[in-house]
Amino acid sequence: MAYQIFAPRHILLLAVVTSAIGFSTPESVAAQCLAYEPKVVRLSGVIVSETHPGRPNYESIANGDEPETIWVLKLKKAICVIASDDINVEADNEKEIQLVLEADQYRRYRRLLGQRVDVSGKLFHSHTGHHHKTLLLKTNEIRKQPAP
């Protein structure tokens, strides 16, 4: 008889535990991750300018490599991206995205350096020496966030 009294509690506990475990399955984590191109994504953060070593060795400006200045979107919260092929591999816990812009976009958006912005574009994974961050975003548009 005691079994019948406690059975509903055990069922409730089992349901709660199963629910909690369900939220951390690989499928649910993947559902929270972003997709690579051709999917357009929207990210928020602050744009900063950084200088990195470029040609010929991509190692040291002091030792003769050309300086390469890039724009980076610094995210408040890290993101993950689901692998789509051999180049666009899985990425996890990324908080900095290198922005890829056309020359006219650098002129148009220069006033937004240091500002909180929303950026839309297509993600891809680094694959050359000019790619200084793990993730890059071929940028469609940048909009300044309204003041809080």
Sequence positions of predicted segments:
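OB-fold/S1-family single-stranded nucleic acid-binding modules
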Residues: 75, 127-148
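Beta-strand/loop nucleic-acid-binding surfaces
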Residues: 83-108
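C-terminal segment of classical bacterial N-terminal signal peptides
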Residues: 19-28
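Short boundary/loop segments of OB/S1/cold-shock single-stranded nucleic-acid-binding domains
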Residues: 29-39
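Short nucleic-acid-contacting surface segments enriched for D/E, G, S/T with interspersed K/R
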Residues: 104-119
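Bacterial N-terminal signal peptides that target proteins for export
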Residues: 1-14
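Structural detector for short beta-strands of small beta-barrel domains
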Residues: 38-69, 79, 121
